[in-house]
Amino acid sequence: MTIKEKNNYIVNRDISWMYFNRRILDEASNETNPLLERLSFLGIYSSNLDEFFQIRVATLGRMIELEENMHPINTNSKKVLKKILKLNEDYTLDFETIFMDLKSELQKENIFLVNELEMTPSQEKCVDSFYREELMNSLFPILVSRMSVEPKLNDKSIYLAVKISNTVKHEKNDKKEYALIEIPTGEFSRFFVLPKEGEKTCIMFLDDVIRYCLPYIFAQLNHDKYEAYTIKFTRDAEMEFDNTAYESVLEKVSKGVKSRRDGLPVRFVFDREIPSDLLRFTEKLLKIDKRDVHVCGARYHNLQDLISFPKIRRSELKYKNHPPIPVRAFEDSINLISLIRKKDQFIHCPYNSFDNFIRLLRESAINPEVKAIKISIYRLAKNSKVIMALICAALNGKKVTAIVELLARFDESSNINWATKMRDAGIKVILGIEGLKVHSKLAHITARKGNIACIGTGNFHEGTATVYTDFTLMTAHKGIVDEVESVFDFLEQPYLNPTFKQLIVAPQYMRKKLISLIKTEIDNAKEGKPAYILCKINHIVDSKIIEKLYQASNAGVVIKLLVRGNCSLITGVPKQSENIEALGIIDRYLEHCRIMIFANGGEERYFLGSADWMLRNLDFRVEVYTPVYDTDLQKQLKTVIEFGLKDNVTARIVDGSGKNLINYTANETPFRSQEELYNFYKRNYEYSFIEIEKQIT
């Protein structure tokens, strides 16, 4: 395939990301979702967009500068950025429309978002008290028209840009003042719930509470007119390291985290009603220039806070409660290590509880036959029970080794703190490998009667395990367990070059193995044997993998994909990808599993692991896929993919067009895969309970 042909059949990764985030925005307008969950989708959309500008748009800006120095006209990055900004402009207008629609829907439920001009006298009295008793001493206005030192502003915060003047001109005090007030959302909720009046629940943005209090805040200035407009800016958050400096990885990452405060602005968002003089003054203060992205928006920004909208006691406006379903085998066992030795086990979070994994670590920490525990760590919960179990094991005399990836984006500081705590407890901590991110999710437990290993698709993080769908395989299969230990040997001694027969490991072998697996399907299709690929993954953007999938499609291989995020592959193109279908599911849980099933001529091969089909995962990270041999677990993986492909409520067609049409045919019975999967697991658990009772009686 020539470069020109590739460009025709591959969507740019950043544009495909915009299409993905649009699917989240679409769920905010999806009336099958409960009302307060639709607000949450707006928050998720906003949060994602912030990070996208911090990393990807900032990177595009640097690439444009580089390309302009080489080829000044029509750089490719410039075209991509132009397309992104046009999509962002369109999506921003849709976001505002959806938000206003949801406000109207809230009013039908007697929930009102009121501003500073819409309060009743009793509500004003309540806000007065809140300001004087709690809020006042957390507000530190900067009179920017008088300041002598340039302020260090936080791009994670939102600010009110305030213009202070007089309604009637005074000879002695006719000077306008400009001020900035950081809205203290780190200390207070973004939303202030007013006392209930009858059946009405009234809620204010903290921004509006502060607007109401401006006469109190600036009382000493002797002005009587206050205009306040929300602004937000985003800095370049990519970290750069001086590899010539003689510093430890820990020191380099610590410096990199601090340097984010000095990153150049890449986006400036402001209220479209802001007066031109205040806008110019603010731009000058923040050093915003014409090259930075300007987003002219509505009254409120940083709406990621909608994720934490007040918990109103209206259960019908939220998702139905889905408590984790117990794993029957775990319930019936007092020794998980012995259980796993007898038969491979799965936990599928959040359908099953992550507590099962913590239980395994806790049991290992006190089990006399356990000698050592090794684990790879990418992201951790704020109060990590995983770390507590590892520390417990170390204190009980076990040899504990933790591979901690310091460069897990935006979790660097947290991982540095945890690494320090573990070292203080006597745990051997290895801070990754220079030049390679350790993204694999592995644990290895050495025990006298036989070792076991855990291989996961997601982080060992009890927080995200309640909202991310992830599998963890627990196995005593000797070939797999020994090779997991070999991965840890490599992480401890990167000069080693281990070989693998069971695991698919990046960066050494994964790309080559994936290409080989796809080629086998191509060969089988040509020979008339069963040939198909079923895959559930987060992102597909690697051009070489996509090219091989196109070849497979042309050879007659049926390819069905569930792709949550970026998808650079274009489906349904005649003589190119007509045998490829792709769906993206956005629902109450974030789809995070990576599962691969290959027909293999009728003897299916099953894999799960940590890697997406991206250049970074295949060539620049330590990633692991494991085969799944247990037939019961294979059936479970197949069910997950089949349910996803059948979804016609939250699954959208991912074909490269960005239309994101729902995967629905007229007169179909609604099938929501996450809901159906939960019910499936629940029925299986209840059925197993009934069978046990029958045996007892």
Regions found by a protein language model. Give the residues of each.
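N-terminal localization/anchoring segments of enzymes in phospholipid and broader phosphate metabolism
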Residues: 1-533, 551-555, 565-589, 593-697
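Glycine/threonine-rich ATP-lid/beta-loop region of ATP-binding domains
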Residues: 543-550
